[in-house]
Amino acid sequence: MAAKIFPVVKFATKVTIAGGALYVAYDSGLLGGSNEGSVALARAKSAIPPAVDEWMKYFGFELPATPKIEFSPLDAWNSGVQKSIHALSVAPSTVGDYTKQGLQYVKDLSK
């Protein structure tokens, strides 16, 4: 009997955890628009450092200082996305050009 109930309990536990995570994400504004996401990020940035300090005092060890970066990861991410999308948008014409060059090369070889 327990062997038949265990998979159901296991599945129910997984569904409950996933549903709870989805509820928390929706409630905190992570699944909304970019404005709601920005507000949620600002709340997280203001809440995380005090929590880390509290846990460091509780456990008695100290984390190293976060390194300062000279560039914005957001800009780097956006430029990478823009380059990728640009490469995908010009891919059909580029493939056509390479095909023409390849056919011309084969024609020149056969002469």
UniProtKB/Swiss-Prot annotation:
Coiled coil: none annotated. Keywords: Membrane, Mitochondrion, Mitochondrion inner membrane, Transmembrane, Transmembrane helix. InterPro entries: Mic13. It comes from Danio rerio. The chain crosses the membrane at residues 8-26. Belongs to the MICOS complex subunit Mic13 family. One of its GO terms (cellular component) is mitochondrial crista junction. GO terms for biological process: cristae formation. Its main location: mitochondrion. This is MICOS complex subunit MIC13.
